Each structure stands twice: as structure tokens, then as C-alpha cells.
């Protein structure tokens, strides 16, 4: 529905614009938007907002961005693969129209970039909202004719413009979703001399299972039925919390520690600046009588005069130690080992088990995050298939149950580095023992298009067997011809003659040479 031109898009809107213009927001929504604004400020490096002006140095070490980027990379950096269970039962023979359709939709919506946006929204705000919608051919700018039947869009909607309403008795049941953001509206004023003035109004789109209503300001502009019977929005929580409809942000516990770290680093910076150009204290003399500058010599001072720089009587060891403790707490509470962010660590031929143990906090956190992401992607796939059926972009294969048609499995790529040779040896052993299938082995190796790859391998195997059979047949023919020639020689020599063996040859001659000798009188090897 975001297909008309606007100066302000739903992707660059500021939370404050909605807070200032929308008076119908609940206290809960206002608090949520304020929290989102704080999270985004810290991610973008604005750590000193709202603290007032100061002459002190403002050192900013943005660990919030580094932590979020690491979480996103570790969880979704390798992407994911989709499989349809009933299509994988006989992967070497069965076609996969549903899997191919889903892969086509995700790839058309830039799957990798979508994963990054999804991960950022989850990690920063605690939630990611994804909308699945259909664009008709007349709504698409398609100069290359790539979408004659329209296209299905999958978009990550900013959480600061989504206002969900849940059932009072079921916190997981979504009964209404409102998308609201300010847009620029041009209005004509005056009867004789008209001019266009630009004002901001809130555009709202209210989705229920039956209808979709659009508002511009307080005026209802459009109402149309919901053709899908579902609310095509999916909420993916970052980390769930019992009793709450929103997820937990990865920055919730990191921000206070990052602020304290910046404060103490700024204090140390101020101390260093102070002692690099210290204050000079003069006792018993006038400053005007002393010449300032480098390589100057002061003489003729009064007897009791004294000049010295203001010095620090204690070192910075305690401050540096406190900062070190803050960084340790930051990594422990943030669930990211210091080495994962590029810290110095001894790297050798580390085993996979040791590497997993070192990164265990990050792995455990990612495992929880992926549980919700996997379930959310499955819901998105169901919506894609339902919209595809409604818009006649796909059909249910004959004999396939509805439950099987909408059922998909999601597999994430393991982002921990592995020894490829050891992994292959382990897979080979499991295949020999019958503990693994070729399809499962390819999934573990992160192969794409497994079905087509298995078909290609099977075709190559059949071709190699055909070539081997042809070679065996040729060899058999050659052996038969040789045997026939040898038999002919034996029959001509007669049973009374006993051939002498020499180096494995009959009378020192090969069967071919013997035939030549019988027919021409010479075996062809003599120079006579």
C-alpha cells in the first residue's frame, strides 16, 4: 500500500513526529516509542543526548553498534534455507514447485539484505515486524516485463510505526494492526489567487481480518475488504519475556554500562588534557614580571618566591582498573566474548569443541534468538503461499494435503568456522555406516539447490556406469578375438606338435606371429 509518492517515507520517520502529531497514542505506546528512540540513538552513536552542554571531553566508544552487528552477523549473516518436508521424501525424483516458489519470492525480495534488516530491528528494538503484500501489475514500475502477473513483497516495517492490538485473553492473538506515519500533504488555499501550502498529516492504515481502512489525518479516505482473511503482519520477537507482548532488546542491559564507560573514559581524557598543559602556580612574585614561553629563564625573583606546576599526587591506576572491570562486565552481560569483537587471542589449530566453548555465551544467546526467528519465517512462508494461492500465482499440487502444503522447515547456516576436511571425513564415515543420507550431508555442507545437485550427481553416475560398461564390452571383444586367433593357430599346428614355451609365448612367438608364419612363411619379425 506504500506505492504513492511521499516526501516522508515510513522508513525515515522520526518517533518525535508521531509523538507530537498523534494525540490518540496510549501511554504504553508513547513509552515504547521513547524507548525505541533511545535504542536507536545509542546504536547510531548519540550517547550524550539529553545530558546538557559541558566543556568536558565527550568520548564515545560505541559498543552498542558493535554488539548489535555481531549478533546480526552471527544469527543471520549466513542466511537460511527453506525446505518442504513432503517434497524432500524422494528428493531425487520428486519435483519441488513449492520450494522453488518460496525461494523465488525470497530472492526477489533480496533475501540477504532482508535478513540484515530483520536482525537489526530485532536486536535494537526487541521486535521485528514483517509485512507480506501483493502488488498488481498496474502498481509496479516494470520496464523489463519481469512481473506480468504481479509480485509478492516481503518488507521489514519499522517498529516505531506499528501499533498492534492483541486479544485481552490471548496475548499471542493479533486482532488489529495500525500502521501510522506522517506524510507531506499539499493543499490549495485562496479562491482567486491560489497557492499550495505544505502541511504534515498522519497517514494510517488499519488492518483487521475482514477489512482495511485508510485515514489521512482524522478523515477516512478508503475502505476495502481484506481478501486474505488474515492480518498479513508477522511479529518476530528478539528474546521473549513471559507476560509481555514485546521482545527484549539486546541493548537493554548494555546501554547503562556503555554510558558509564564513556563517562570514565571522558574523565581520564580530561585529566590527561589537564596535565599536558598544567596550571602554573607562582608564590611571592607577579605574573607580569615573568616572561612566558619556551626556553625562557626566570631570574631576580624575590627570596621567598616559588613557582611550580599543579601536579596530580596519585596515578590513574584505579581509574584504568575500573574501566577494565567495566569492559569485562560489558562483555559478560552482553553475552559476547571479548575475542569475538577482535580482541587479542591466541589462534592455533583450535578444535571445534574448544571454539564453541569459548563462544558459548554468544551461541546460547543466538540459539534463543533463532527459535523465534525460525517460527517467524515459517509464518511468513505460510502468508506467501496463501497470497500466492489467492492471486493464482501457485496452485496446490494434486493429492497434497493443506497441512503439508503450508508446512516448511528453516535451516540456518552455522557461522562458527570449521575444519572442512574433518567435517568431510565425519560425513563420509556416517554415510558408510548408514547413519546419514546424501541430502542431510549436503545440508550440513550448506549446499544450495540440493534436489538439482542430487539429480546431477545421479546423472553423472549413470553416465560413468554406461562408459564403464562400454569399455568392458570392448575389452571382452578384444579378448574373444585374441582367443579365436590362438585357437586357430593351435588347430593348424596339430595335436602331435608340442609347442615350446619361451617367456610365456608359444614357441617364442605370439599367436599373431604364428598366423603370419603359416600364411606367408615368415612371422614378420625376421630380417631375412
Predicted regions mapped to residue ranges:
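C-terminal helix-loop subdomains that flank or include functional centers
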Residues: 293-305, 314, 318, 325-528
Amino acid at each position: 500500500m506504500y506505492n504513492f509518492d511521499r516526501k516522508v517515507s515510513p522508513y525515515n520517520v522520526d518517533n518525535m513526529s508521531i509523538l507530537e502529531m498523534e494525540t490518540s497514542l496510549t501511554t504504553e505506546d508513547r513509552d515504547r516509542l521513547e524507548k525505541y528512540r533511545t535504542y536507536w540513538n545509542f546504536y547510531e552513536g548519540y550517547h550524550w543526548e539529553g545530558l546538557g552542554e559541558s566543556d568536558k571531553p565527550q568520548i564515545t566508544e560505541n559498543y552498542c553498534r558493535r554488539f548489535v552487528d555481531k549478533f546480526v552477523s552471527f544469527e543471520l549473516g549466513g542466511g537460511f534455507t527453506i525446505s518442504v518436508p513432503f517434497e524432500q521424501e524422494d528428493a531425487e525424483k520428486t519435483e519441488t514447485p513449492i520450494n522453488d516458489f518460496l525461494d523465488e519470492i525470497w530472492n526477489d525480495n533480496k533475501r540477504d539484505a532482508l535478513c540484515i534488516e530483520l536482525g537489526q530491528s530485532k536486536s535494537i528494538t526487541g521486535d521485528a515486524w514483517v509485512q507480506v503484500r501483493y502488488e498488481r501489475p498496474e502498481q509496479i514500475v516494470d520496464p523489463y516485463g519481469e512481473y506480468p502477473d504481479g509480485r509478492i513483497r516481503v518488507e521489514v516495517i519499522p517498529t516505531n510505526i506499528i501499533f498492534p492490538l492483541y486479544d485481552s485473553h490471548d496475548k499471542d492473538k493479533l486482532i488489529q494492526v495500525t500502521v501510522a506515519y506522517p506524510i507531506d500533504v499539499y493543499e490549495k488555499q485562496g479562491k482567486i489567487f491560489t497557492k499550495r501550502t505544505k502541511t504534515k498529516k498522519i497517514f494510517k492504515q488499519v488492518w483487521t481480518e475482514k477489512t482495511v481502512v485508510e485515514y489521512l489525518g482524522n478523515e477516512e479516505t478508503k475502505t476495502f475488504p481484506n481478501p486474505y482473511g488474515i492480518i498479513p503482519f508477522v511479529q518476530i520477537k528478539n528474546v521473549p519475556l513471559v507476560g509481555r507482548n514485546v521482545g527484549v532488546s539486546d541493548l537493554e542491559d548494555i546501554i547503562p554500562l556503555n554510558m558509564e564507560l564513556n563517562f570514565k573514559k571522558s574523565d581520564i581524557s580530561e585529566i590527561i588534557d589537564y596535565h599536558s598543559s598544567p596550571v602554573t602556580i607562582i608564590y611571592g612574585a607577579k605574573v607580569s614580571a615573568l616572561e612566558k614561553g619556551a626556553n625562557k629563564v626566570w631570574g631576580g625573583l624575590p627570596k621567598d618566591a616559588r613557582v611550580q606546576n599543579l601536579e596530580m599526587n596519585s596515578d590513574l591506576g584505579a581509574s584504568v582498573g575500573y574501566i577494565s572491570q567495566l569492559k569485562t562486565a560489558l562483555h559478560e552481560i552482553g553475552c559476547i566474548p571479548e575475542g569475538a569483537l577482535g580482541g587479542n587471542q591466541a589462534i592455533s589449530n583450535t578444535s571445534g569443541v574448544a571454539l564453541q566453548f569459548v563462544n558459548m555465551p554468544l551461541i546460547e544467546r543466538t540459539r534463543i534468538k533463532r527459535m523465534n526467528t525460525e517460527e517467524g519465517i515459517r509464518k511468513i512462508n505460510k502468508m506467501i503461499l496463501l497470497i500466492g494461492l489467492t492471486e493464482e500465482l501457485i496452485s496446490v499440487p494434486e493429492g497434497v494435503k493443506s497441512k503439508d502444503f503450508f508446512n516448511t522447515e528453516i535451516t540456518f547456516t552455522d557461522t562458527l568456522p570449521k575444519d572442512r576436511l574433518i567435517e568431510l571425513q565425519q560425513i563420509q564415515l556416517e554415510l558408510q555406516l548408514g547413519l546419514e543420507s546424501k541430502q542431510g550431508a549436503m545440508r550440513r555442507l550448506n549446499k544450495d539447490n540440493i534436489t538439482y545437485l542430487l539429480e546431477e550427481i545421479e546423472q553423472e553416475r549413470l553416465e560413468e556406469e554406461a562408459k564403464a560398461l562400454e569399455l568392458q564390452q570392448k575389452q571382452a571383444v578384444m579378448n574373444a578375438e585374441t582367443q579365436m586367433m590362438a585357437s586357430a593357430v593351435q588347430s593348424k599346428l596339430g595335436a602331435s606338435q608340442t609347442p615350446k614355451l619361451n617367456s610365456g609365448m608359444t614357441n617364442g612367438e605370439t599367436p599373431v606371429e604364428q598366423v603370419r608364419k603359416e600364411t606367408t612363411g615368415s612371422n614378420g619379425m625376421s630380417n631375412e
